[in-house]
């Protein structure tokens, strides 16, 4: 059932993008920009992203960012399997926010890091990103955002709902 819901959600997002692209010609640059903005807003209302900001760009901070990503993903994924829409996903993330923060801090401490971690549901800007066959335009999206230390390093992101998070964990 969950797989059907994810496939249906992705199909709706793809169809929205295809219709928006067809209804605007690239020759009319203003219309093309408006089309992209409309498409992004439509998609943004249907997905919840996951964003982890590293403390810095040092190799150690970048490595622990990935470990936090994996630990939080392993913790929250079983709860998200029951979610059938973005509202349920958002509620589940909120219900488990204290544990998400605790898992993040425990992962940092287990790897010898003394800086902290915070997490929140927020709206933030994302660049264009492709997950498998699906490309999401740059723009502002709702996200579970985890900040490690100063949050000044390169970050990692994915789509939490529908769950596309671990299709590409190399970037």
Model-identified regions with their sequence ranges:
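Positively charged n-region of N-terminal signal peptides that target proteins for export
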Residues: 1-4
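Early exported N-terminus immediately downstream of N-terminal targeting peptides
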Residues: 46-97
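Mid-length scaffold segments of soluble, non-membrane domains
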Residues: 86-154, 159
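Flexible, solvent-exposed short loops/turns enriched in glycine
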Residues: 32, 157-171
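Intrinsically disordered, low-complexity acidic/polar segments
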Residues: 59-61, 128, 155, 167
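Hydrophobic membrane-insertion alpha-helices, especially the h-region
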Residues: 6-20
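N-terminal, intrinsically disordered, polar/charged segments of Gram-positive cell-envelope systems
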Residues: 25-49
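Solvent-exposed residues in well-ordered beta-strands and their adjoining turns
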Residues: 53-55, 149, 161
């Amino acid at each position: 059932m969950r797989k059907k819901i994810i496939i249906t959600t992705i199909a709706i997002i793809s169809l929205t993008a295809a219709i928006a692209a067809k209804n605007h010609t690239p020759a009319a640059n203003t219309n093309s920009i408006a089309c992209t903005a409309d498409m992004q807003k439509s998609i943004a209302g249907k997905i919840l992203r996951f964003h982890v900001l590293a403390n810095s760009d040092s190799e150690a901070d970048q490595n622990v960012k990935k470990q936090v990503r994996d630990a939080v993903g392993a913790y929250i994924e079983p709860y998200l399997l029951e979610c059938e829409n973005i509202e349920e996903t958002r509620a589940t993330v909120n219900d488990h926010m204290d544990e998400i923060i605790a898992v993040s801090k425990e992962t940092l401490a287990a790897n010898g890091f003394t800086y902290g971690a915070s997490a929140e549901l927020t709206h933030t800007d994302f660049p264009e990103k492709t997950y498998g066959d699906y490309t999401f335009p740059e723009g502002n999206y709702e996200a579970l955002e985890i900040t490690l230390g100063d949050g000044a390093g390169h970050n990692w992101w994915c789509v939490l709902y529908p769950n596309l998070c671990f299709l590409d964990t190399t970037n």
